[in-house]
Amino acid sequence: MAAAAVVEFQRAQSLLSTDREASIDILHSIVKRDIQENDEEAVQVKEQSILELGSLLAKTGQAAELGGLLKYVRPFLNSISKAKAARLVRSLLDLFLDMEAATGQEVELCLECIEWAKSEKRTFLRQALEARLVSLYFDTKRYQEALHLGSQLLRELKKMDDKALLVEVQLLESKTYHALSNLPKARAALTSARTTANAIYCPPKLQATLDMQSGIIHAAEEKDWKTAYSYFYEAFEGYDSIDSPKAITSLKYMLLCKIMLNTPEDVQALVSGKLALRYAGRQTEALKCVAQASKNRSLADFEKALTDYRAELRDDPIISTHLAKLYDNLLEQNLIRVIEPFSRVQIEHISSLIKLSKADVERKLSQMILDKKFHGILDQGEGVLIIFDEPPVDKTYEAALETIQNMSKVVDSLYSKAKKLT
């Protein structure tokens, strides 16, 4: 019985590159076959077949079948060790969730697995699955639920020895706080995660996630784009080494750093590099267009890139936030360049030069006047901008402060001399 299963499994593996459907059918037949619990070889072959079948279903985009497989194998899990059962469930669930197929059953399936782990009294597996559920809540923007479950899980994990899972949950907490714009707490959670990670060996995926979050926090809080770039590069190498789909995201963030550092010319060199070449596509093209617009200081090209690559740029909250700031800076630079030769200019004329609506130009000019980017007033009655010369800096206060400082030194000197005489 076991020998026949081994032969079938080997045949299924040999068909992986030529006929995936046939390979899936063979693996299905092995998985559905009843086996004797005391037949170790048959149990091992069935376990390998389940993992191989799960991987194939994920690669071929069969999310519903993969979800069904996860439920179907539960009775078999009682015939293998708890550690192997936990690995099998986690692997299948990770494959299902990493597909990002948006079936709408992700949370439900995860909760079912958690309930099964609770009923079987498998604490470690339950904690691992709850960590995955926190991640799922984060991905579906259910931030309060993510924080609530995450804080419960953290209290449990700090009493136990699973440091890798603790790092994972601390990272998720940091991501959630960042999504809620609570940067101090996001940074504190990240610091905790890095401290815990320093004491253990981090698998490549976890290390890459840690580097990615470090880059995001450095970019968001400190605007330290050079440090952020080095973190994103480390994350990219980590994800690339395990063929993770998140590698392209870290590459996008690397390109974003180059744009924000005012070195858009480096973007082309990065994209055509050996490591990044395999990720060429719409994601990288979007950032290349933004880099070109930034280099040419062209608002029209910038807006065209945002329209043409809406999904790649606007739907990513990290890129969208920073590109909004870049657009704002670019608009200010363009406006200052346009109004520089004038002392009085029609707003209509400015809007025609930079190809933006009159209302948008008026709103931005008002903001710039309030921020003291230049001195002037808007005459809305006549629809003109009146620009004043920059007033000379009044140095009276500086001179007064300098005089007081010098007098203070004289008084101190006289006091020390008088003290010596007494």
Curated annotation (Swiss-Prot):
Which keywords describe this protein according to UniProt?
A: Acetylation, Isopeptide bond, Phosphoprotein, Proteasome, Ubl conjugation
> SMART domains of this UniProt entry?
PAM, PINT
Q: Which Gene3D superfamilies match?
A: 1.25.40.570
Q: Where is this cross-link: Glycyl lysine isopeptide (Lys-Gly) (interchain with G-Cter in SUMO2)?
A: 274
Q: Which domain of life is it from?
A: Eukaryota
In this chain, where does the modification Phosphoserine occur? 14, 23
Q: Which GO terms describe its biological process?
A: proteasome assembly; stem cell differentiation; ubiquitin-dependent protein catabolic process
Domain PCI as annotated: residue spans: 224-392
Q: Which Pfam family is an annotated match for this chain, by its short name?
A: PCI
**Cysteine disulfide partners in this protein:** none
Provide the positions where the record notes the PTM N-acetylalanine. Answer: 2
Q: Name one GO cellular component term.
A: proteasome regulatory particle
Identify its protein family: Belongs to the proteasome subunit S9 family.
- What is this protein for, i.e. what is its function? Component of the 26S proteasome, a multiprotein complex involved in the ATP-dependent degradation of ubiquitinated proteins. This complex plays a key role in the maintenance of protein homeostasis by removing misfolded or damaged proteins, which could impair cellular functions, and by removing proteins whose functions are no longer required. Therefore, the proteasome participates in numerous cellular processes, including cell cycle progression, apoptosis, or DNA damage repair. In the complex, PSMD11 is required for proteasome assembly.
Instruction: Note the subunit structure.
Output: Component of the 19S proteasome regulatory particle complex. The 26S proteasome consists of a 20S core particle (CP) and two 19S regulatory subunits (RP). The regulatory particle is made of a lid composed of 9 subunits including PSMD11, a base containing 6 ATPases and few additional components.
Protein name, as recorded: 26S proteasome non-ATPase regulatory subunit 11
Lineage of source species: Eukaryota, Metazoa, Chordata, Craniata, Vertebrata
The coding gene here is Psmd11
